[in-house]
Amino acid sequence: RMKVRMTYCNMETEELRYFTQEYSVRELEEWFFSLLEEYKKWADFGYEWQQIRTDSIRALVFPYAYREGQKELAGYVYRSIVRGKKLFIEAPTGVGKTLSTVFPAVKAVGEGKAERIFYLTAKTITRTVADNTFQLLRGKGLRMKTVILTAKDKICFLEEADCNPAACPFAKGHYDRINEAMYDLLLHEDHYHRETIEEYARRYQVCPFELSLDMSLFSDGIICDYNYVFDPHVYLKRFFGEGSQTQGAGGPYLFLIDEAHNLVERGREMYSAVLVKEDFLALKRMVKEYDRKLERQLEKCNTALLALKRECEGFRVIPVKEIDDLVNGVERLSETMGSWLEEHDESPVREEILE
């Protein structure tokens, strides 16, 4: 027989807890090989799907007779991908830019020049145009899986999004059912738009937003807002986080950015932040009777802001190194606040704090 130990580590206190069980070699073998079988079905599907996808792409032809300039545009796009270059396109409405960029991008995926396509847009209507373009190509024989990512507050089944399992029946037990929901979707659908995601989420009682994110891992095309790639707070860590495959020229991902000129202003918004001193004071008064540690950390942030306020009479740009006290205080506060909210999901001030 063999002893197996599982170790839990508290990230804040570094306290360790050990759980030890004893099993026979046969029990461990059965567990291990059953686990391998579960992984194998996903690996088999991935391998077989890649063959199906690649064969369909290589057989795909442009769905219409080329309009004036369309063939040249598609050629520029394909050559830019092959050479690992960036391409900026400006053309009148009605030229067929979407099809002329999506088609060569799809062809590049079929030739192994990229792993998947991200179609980024800021508007629902252009998201629909991109989706319709993939559907058009499917009608001509393309086999690619595409997903449209919808904002959590729009796709959530609750009136107000609350991911607490005690409040949301779709969050409770989500991870017990999500694999079955995903596998069913993979076997029977290629087009993961909002209605399909919601249908399967209800059928398997899982979170529709998390289901769409999980399906993105198995999708060849992802249609989404700019922020899923560029926003430092909500970007898709499964693709762009530390340790993931990197983006960029010659990398595994292609980015088709609709109305890219809008990205400048959106980028400013994504990378800008405002902290109001009075908000820290109000929050401090709110939590005073519930948690002294939180109160102290809020007071430290307030003190740091007060010191900066004195230094900034009039207008002055402060180097980042001069706000270390504030940055460190806010980081500690964020960590403590996150833990407190998890542990006090029924606190009378929880909603006010979140606001």
What is each stretch, according to the model?
Residues 26-59:
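Charged, low-complexity
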Residues 1-28:
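Nucleic-acid nuclease catalytic cores
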Residues 47-90:
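Conserved pre-motif I regulatory segment
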Residues 354-355:
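Segments forming glycine/polar-rich beta-alpha architectures that bind adenosine-containing cofactors
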Residues 82-104:
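Walker A/P-loop
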Residues 51-55, 60, 113-222, 227-230, ...:
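A substrate-engagement module of RecA-like helicase motors
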